[in-house]
Each structure stands twice: as C-alpha cells, then as structure tokens.
Amino acid sequence: MGHLHIVHWRLTMNGAIAALFLCLVMVHQQHAVRILAVFPTPAYSHHSVFKVYIEALAERGHDVVVIKSTDRINYANRNGLRGNVSEIDASLSQEYYGRLMRHAGVFRKRGIVADSSTVTAHNYMGLVRMMSDQFDLPIVKSFIEEAHKHKFDLLITEAYIDYPLVFSHLFGDLPVVQISSGYAVAENFETMGAVSRHPVYYPNLWRDKFSGLNVWKQSMKCTLSWRYRMNLVNWPDEQNALLKRQFGESTPTIQELRNRVELLFVNTHAIFDNNRPVPPSVQYLGALHLHDKRPDSMYGMVREFLDNATTGAIYVSFGSAISSEDMEPEFIEMLLRVFEKLPYSILWKYDGYMNRMPANVFVQSWFEQYNLLHHKNVRAFVTQGGVQSTDEAVEAIVPMVGMPMMGDQAYNMNKIVELGLGKVVDTVRVNAEQLIEAIVDVAESPKYRKRLRELRHMIHHQPMTPLQKAVWYTEHVIESRRRVVPTMLKTRAANVNYSDYIMSYVFVPFIMFTVMNHLRQLLKMNMV
C-alpha cells in the first residue's frame, strides 16, 4: 500500500513538473519573437556593434535572421544562446563598397582625408545603389521572393540610410528599430521628431571645423550646412524611384516607410551629442561593443615590446577603413620623422611595405586594440577619431591625439577636445613639429587622464547598461506590437515635413496679407 502511495506521489510530481515545464515553454513561446535584421554597410566597426546587440536579443530567446554584408563578423558562432541566430551572407557587397569608396572622390587629400565637399547626394546615392545591388544578390532575392513563408515581428536596420526600410513592407508591415553604430544623422532625428539641425548647438556631423570660428567663418559653415541640406532635398525621391523599379509600383515611399520607425538607438553617449533634446523614441547607448568586455592578457612580441617601453608607448592606428596603400608617400614620411624624434616606443597599425623603419617602431597589420590600450605603459593614442576607437580609449583612460580623416571623425574629435580628453590636429596641413608637440603634450600632461577618469565614472553611473537599455526598449516595441497598441514613445512631430513643422500655413498667409496691405497703402498714396 505504501509502495502504491509512493508511486502515486511520484506520478503526481512528474505530472506537476511536466505541467510547469509546459507552462514555461508556452510563456517563452508567447514572448519570444522572430526578428529580421538588415545591416547593409560592410564596415567591420559597424558590425562589431550590431553583433553584441543581436546576441543579446538571441540570449532573451528571440530568433534573429541577419542579412549581413561582411564576412569578417560571424553572427551565428556563439553556442548556448536561448534563441537562434541565422545569417544570410551578402558579403559580396564588400568589394563593391571598397570600389565605391575609391571612385566616389572621398579619399582626396594626402590620399586618405575626405572633406565636407564629398558629402553629396551623388555619393549618397552610390551607397543606396550598393544596397540595391546587395538586395538583388541571388541569396537575398530568393529570401525576399519567399517572404510569404516567413513570419517576422520586428525589423532592425542600420540607421543613416533609409533604403533598407523597404523590408518592413516586403515582410508584412513590420515595426522598425533603427540602430546607428555611432552618431545618427539629421534625417534620423527628423524621422523621430527630435531636434535635428542647428549650426551652433547641433551642427552638421560632416563639418570639419567647429571651434575658434569668427563671425565670417561661422557664417560660411552655416552656408555649408544649408548647401548640404539643399543638395539632399531630392534624395528621397531618387530612392523612391529606385524602390519602385526594384520592388514594384506598390512599394511605399521612403517618407511613408519612415512612419514605421518606432525607435532609434544612437550608439554614443549623450554628452558627445551635446545632450540633444530627444523624445523617448530616441535612446542613447554608447560603447555597446564593450559590454562586459575585459582586457585579456597579451603574449608574444607585442607584450614584450610594451613591457620594455620604459619611457612609455604611443599607439598609432587610423582604423579598419583606412588602407596604408592609400596614404601618400609625403604623409608616410612625415609620420616616420615624427616617430624618429619621439622619446617613446611606437606601435603602428600599418599594412603596407616599408623600405625603412625607425628602431623604436613596431609595425603590424592588426592589433588587439582594446587589450593594447589597457597596458600600463601606453601613454597616448594617435587615432583617426572613430567612435569605437574613442570609446575604447575612454574605457582604458588613454588620452588621444586626433587625426580625423572622414565621416563624423572631425565632429567626434572636436568633442574629445571640448571635454578635455585629448587634442586634435588638421590632418591635411599638420607638419612633423606640430604633431610631435601634440603627442608629447597629451602623453605627459596629467590633466587629460584626470578628465578621462571623471568622464568614465559619469558614463558608468547609470541605472542600466547600454545593452540592457537596448534590449528593454526593443522588447517594449515587440510587446506593443503583440498587444496591438502604440508604443507611446513617439512625438507628434515625428516625420513631419518642414512646411508643417514651421507652420507655414500660419505665417505664409500672414506675410501675404501684410505685403498686400502695404501695397494697397502705397497705391492709395500714389493715387492721392
């Protein structure tokens, strides 16, 4: 009899455990969703940010399909995730991207430096056509043609170009989360109804000068910003024409697709964007790729070189997008003269051939930058000013000398100078003496490290980490979609056109009435 009671108890417990497990599975299935992520820019630094975000969503149990454009990042190589990450490899566009950058007139001065004149609708449309060609690759095209076989609940796209928003239409009216790997552009903020443009407080990202400007130079920069805006005014129409040619006449316009964007993630700390006033639908993250990252021990020749750098070491890298073969010989010779005269050991990320190399210089085509910056003997970082590089320098408390070369790097390094974290030089005009002076000042003065410590403490002193914030807000959009309710994050000004935003329907009639009234008065006077 007792044996029967034990058997009955075991059966009851097994049933309860099975029921509990079934409930957990049902709850998990109820909240886990399928996500489509489209990242069409084949830049390593961009994908290193997106990978952390995608893995975190998979860790929460969501299934993610990633259309990726580089073979240097593998989104599906981590075991133990609760969800699943699968890839559609469109990395053939990487060669296209390199060719586009070479032929777009971007790298002009000293072989590697772009100026604001290269930010044109023509060059932007080159990037859009690259994406269009990417979406025509057989593997991507087949995936699109079988859209009826796939059910997705959310689309994640890279911010700054809106062409990939078309996937929200192709796969069934999906809500969209846009994420930038660094700063967002003015058009992204306009989509969200945030403050987007101001020549002083929220200037154009593509400018190369920001401080020490007299009234005349400031006026010229304002004019440049206006020309940039006017140059791109017809850009959405060109994208619309391409969309309809590629995906059919029923394809919504870019302006219509922007209405589906529920959330914008900006992967910089808000202070670097002048603490821009934004609605809740815009969330600043910052250093997403450094989540839970700790420096690993280094071994081999790099470790030995750094350990022996008793007078200090300087790390020199111009990022993953710059090839040494593009540098003009004059620029390389200038750098070599600087290295020879510096009283430090130099580690230089350089992938070209060199006839001579100073004895104090150690060259490799690739360094584990994050680990290297944490070595106790590293005194300064000579950098192009990319967002991920400056994030790593802040985390390692290494002051910077900026030599901006393209994109948002001049803007980013201007903020580094404003915050007292380093110095910046004019990459086009700098000579050896000026660069030596900047490096020695940054390496020797304690004020830069003091400000770096203060800033690092401030950006760490947050209620949640950047990755936790990204996941929480993403799941808020998902939950709103599931419950068929608005996210309540967006402002009424989201994606409003300029004429409505400035209330032209109010002041234009008023101006016309005033002008007509003055004309009437003049006519009366003439008649008298």
From Swiss-Prot:
It is an enzyme of class 2 (transferase). Its EC number is 2.4.1.-. Residues 1-32 form the signal peptide. It comes from the Viruses. Keywords: Glycosyltransferase, Signal, Transferase. It holds the Pfam family UDPGT. InterPro entries: Ecdysteroid_UDP-Glc_Trfase, UDP-glycosyltransferase, UDP_glucos_trans, UDP_glycos_trans_CS. One of its GO terms (molecular function) is UDP-glycosyltransferase activity. Belongs to the UDP-glycosyltransferase family. Catalyzes the transfer of glucose from UDP-glucose to ecdysteroids which are insect molting hormones. Expression of egt interferes with normal insect development and block molting. This is Ecdysteroid UDP-glucosyltransferase. The lineage of its organism: Viruses, Viruses incertae sedis, Naldaviricetes, Lefavirales, Baculoviridae.
